[in-house]
Amino acid sequence: MVVERHNDWFRAPVKRHTTASEFNIDNIAALPQVDIVYSHGNVQPTAVQALVASGAKAIIHAGTGNGSVADRMVKPLQEAQAKGVVIVRSSRVPYGFVLRNAEQPDDKYDWVVAHDMRPEKARILTMLALAQGADTKTLQRMFWEY
């Protein structure tokens, strides 16, 4: 709470951050290409295909509600994944969680859920994680912790 330009903290942050993180940007020479695809009514797979062709290492799918993926997008995302692209489900709505295996069978697809991170923050965490060689299991752990 801020009262007369003075911060009073009542709760410590639960998630890891800043100096408590496992990332050291001094050891990262370059960040991998990670892009965001925003879902909407009548979404087409062309954006996913173009991002894969341009060298994306991961795609953050910004779905509606609980990170929903339209039926017509499942196959293109799986095809991207078959080419080595990591798929992370996030939500474009401002509040709430993307629950693992609720809207999509994430375990079956080996997709990662961003949990409480919006697509833009999920992109940054994914870039840092992939720069360190994280696989999908490690990346999922990071989304639970950060």
List PLM regions with ranges.
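C-terminal non-catalytic interaction/assembly regions of soluble proteins
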Residues: 50, 63-146
